[in-house]
Amino acid sequence: KLNKITIDDYRDVFDFPVQNYYRKLGFDFGKEAFKSSGLDFIKIYENRKFEPQLFNDTLITLNTLKQSGCTHSVLSAQNIVTLKKSVSYYQLDEMFDYISGLEDHYAIGKVDQGKKLIKNLNFKLDEVAMIGDTEHDHEVAEAMGIKCFLMDRGHNSTQRLQSKNTDVYSSFSTL
């Protein structure tokens, strides 16, 4: 049995691939396979996936950027079917030119997806930026050859994000 963790604990240990995060929490994959634990999580997640709300400044920021000529894409380690359902649920379909997710539920990472996405975009690398909330997002942006802005109100703590020596923001308005 694992101990309960706080949001701060979560943000201090969450990692990609997600299997590494499970290990940090104390999972013993010799006793229970990662795929089994991962599917258990997905069952719970599926029942609660629409409980979170968008941050108050999300829609205004997306709309302002879109009106100024910026395009938006989603790059996620989430399963593509679930990701598209979430985008639709939050009525964001018209905001994004590309929605890129994984074919499975195991969140191994998104470097390969990012490289594929950047090839689909009709922009120079210095015209593209990633906004993310994990150290992995920074690594993906580096692999893609683009600028990364990190938000400290997501999966990783401010301290972890600052360790990447990049810009870290607490809201879209400060971005």
Located regions from the model:
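Structural recognition of alpha->loop->beta junctions
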Residues: Y90-L102, R160-L175
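Short, acidic loop-to-helix structural element flanking the phosphoryl-transfer center
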Residues: E46-V74, I80-V87, V111
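Conserved Lys-Pro-Asp/Glu-containing loop-to-beta segment of HAD-superfamily phosphomonoesterases
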Residues: K110-E139
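A short, structured active-site edge motif that brings together acidic residues
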Residues: D9-V13, D93-I108
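Conserved H-loop
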Residues: N3, D28, D93-D97, K124, ...
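Acidic, Mg2+-coordinating phosphoryl-transfer loop and its flanking beta/alpha structural elements
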Residues: A129-S170
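N-terminal helical cap/lid subdomain that shapes the substrate entry/recognition surface
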Residues: K1-N56
